[in-house]
Amino acid sequence: MISVNDFKTGLTIEVDNGIWRVLDFQHVKPGKGAAFVRSKLRNLRTGAIQEKTFRGGEKVAKAQIDNRKMAYLYADGSNHVFMDNESYEQIELPEDQIAHELKFLKENMEINIIMYQGETIGIDLPNTVELVVTATDPGIKGDTSSGGSKPATLETGLVVQVPFFVNEGDKLVINTTEAAYVSRA
């Protein structure tokens, strides 16, 4: 059991018969009344996001999850195949279970598979990934002084806002939690 006062981003807990990852939390101490913790949680089985409020000091069960390092191999219809590089064991995950993460996956990319009681429930991406720009408008001289941005389509189909100096074929570092441009690679 863990106190809600000890919440950290990325912590995995068991609440309401589900396995949830803490995405965000805020300790609130109102002038009147008891303190509470407002949290934003993602269900690791369904991908649903829920906001939940806990009373200060309330205890919740910490989920015992295992992470296995695997490589993304390929898409097979609506399933995606991953392989353990040590045992060469392959597993398939349905597209709807990892829909958010698919925007960042490239073939042969190393990721962590999240396991709970022997069941595969999702994947953990690195904080940043390197992706190549496949389509964007050309930058026009003088545009950089305004500090604006333009949309760019990346090799996985993800569209992000990038600075005007980015061109097709550039390799970019992308933040996976915010789906945002970080820098050139």
From Swiss-Prot:
Keyword Protein biosynthesis applies: yes
This protein's pathway: Protein biosynthesis; polypeptide chain elongation
Record-linked SUPFAM superfamilies: Nucleic acid-binding proteins, Translation proteins SH3-like domain
GO molecular function: translation elongation factor activity
UniProt keyword RNA-binding, yes or no: no
Keyword line: Cytoplasm, Elongation factor, Protein biosynthesis
GO cellular component: cytoplasm
Primary location: cytoplasm
Swiss-Prot/TrEMBL GO biological process terms: peptide biosynthetic process
Gene3D superfamilies: 2.30.30.30, Nucleic acid-binding proteins
Location of the protein in the cell: Cytoplasm
Function: Involved in peptide bond synthesis. Stimulates efficient translation and peptide-bond synthesis on native or reconstituted 70S ribosomes in vitro. Probably functions indirectly by altering the affinity of the ribosome for aminoacyl-tRNA, thus increasing their reactivity as acceptors for peptidyl transferase.
Family in the record: Belongs to the elongation factor P family.
Name the record gives this protein: Elongation factor P
Organism: Listeria welshimeri serovar 6b (strain ATCC 35897 / DSM 20650 / CCUG 15529 / CIP 8149 / NCTC 11857 / SLCC 5334 / V8)
Name of the coding gene: efp
